[in-house]
Amino acid sequence: TEGPDFYIPMVNTTGVVRSPYEYPQYYLVNPAAYAVLGAYMFFLIIVGFPINFLTLYVTLEHKKLRTPLNYILLNLAVADLFMVIGGFTTTMYSSMHGYFVLGRLGCNIEGFFATLGGMISLWSLAVLAIERWVVVCKPISNFRFGENHAIMGVSLTWVMALACTVPPLVGWSRYIPEGMQCACGIDYYTRAEGYNNESFVIYMFTFHFLFPMFIIFFCYGRLLCAVKEAAAAQQESETTQRAEREVTRMVILMVIGYLVCWLPYASVAWFIFTHKGSEFGPLFMAVPSFFAKSSSIYNPIIYICMNKQFRQCMITTLFCGKNPFEGQEEDSSTKTEASSASSVSPA
């Protein structure tokens, strides 16, 4: 059922369909599902906000972490905070009422920040891949990655993300409630007059999903080949090679985490867009959508768990300047220092 600013995945034969901005949508799914949704959003908030804020705080507190190669990882944390503050809080509040209580303006705000965070994350991973490729594979001779290059990379992520999230606010496509009608996203569902949804969805999938994905896979493919060749030739010490492989595993795991979170959402959205008129329930879009939001806790967890230097700094911060595990981490510190010397470590 299509309304002026919404689309309900249900045929209104019984006359029960109501605007998701004004009435509870309990006729779509069991009311208990909204409680589960609210609890899940609360979990993402209480985990996502502290861990991303801690990522920023620890990096800013410890000078040795404030390197150009870490700028893009700070950008990832900022993007996740945008999703937590601007997206998850409104979704949790709406789920408590069973409909999107914040109205049309609130839908635009929630949809904008949630999509902005996702796009910044995707483009940050693309820029991160380019940076690693340039540093490790050295496709440009005599090139030294510096602060200006890092700032340019961060700026690129914001420009590209805004190029995807601003158009729906000014008439090229739009943000509407989706799934269980408690969160908003791009209108993949309708061909409403005056919004040119078809062209925007094609533009979004081509330039803001497939293109950065190509960059990520190309750069990491070349990086893996370079690391393998270096290990085979034993051009560097075993410790350095081990540290470089550790960094490679970290960034690859970050990409896998992103794909696990966002690929189902993108696939379902594309299916809905290319199968106009097909019947699908609210959970068909809601489950991938809310599963995708868990990406806000993937990146910092992966970064903290797989980067020994960052983990040491985090422990020092949490224990007020002391590291109770200093003896256990001594060997790890040596490996990370070797990684830093090779200009591959993200710390």
From Swiss-Prot:
Topology class, membrane: Multi-pass membrane protein
Extracellular topological domain: 1-33, 94-107, 171-199, 272-283
Residue interval(s) of motif 'Ionic lock' involved in activated form stabilization: 131-133
PTM (free text): Phosphorylated on some or all of the serine and threonine residues present in the C-terminal region. Contains one covalently linked retinal chromophore.
Keywords, in A-Z order: Cell projection, Chromophore, Disulfide bond, G-protein coupled receptor, Glycoprotein, Lipoprotein, Membrane, Palmitate, Phosphoprotein, Photoreceptor protein, Receptor, Retinal protein, Sensory transduction, Transducer, Transmembrane, Transmembrane helix, Vision
Topological domain spans for side Cytoplasmic: 59-70, 131-149, 222-249, 306-347
CDD domains referenced in this protein's UniProt entry, alphabetically: 7tmA_MWS_opsin
TM region(s), chain numbering: 34-58, 71-93, 108-130, 150-170, 200-221, 250-271, 284-305
Residues flagged as site, Plays an important role in the conformation switch to the active conformation: 110
An annotated Gene Ontology molecular function: 11-cis retinal binding
Residues covalently joined to lipid (S-palmitoyl cysteine): 320
Top-level division of the source organism's lineage: Eukaryota
A single BP term in Gene Ontology: visual perception
Cell compartments where the protein resides: Membrane; Cell projection, Cilium, Photoreceptor outer segment
Protein name: Rhodopsin
Native species: Sargocentron spiniferum
Species classification: Eukaryota, Metazoa, Chordata, Craniata, Vertebrata
Gene this chain is encoded by: rho
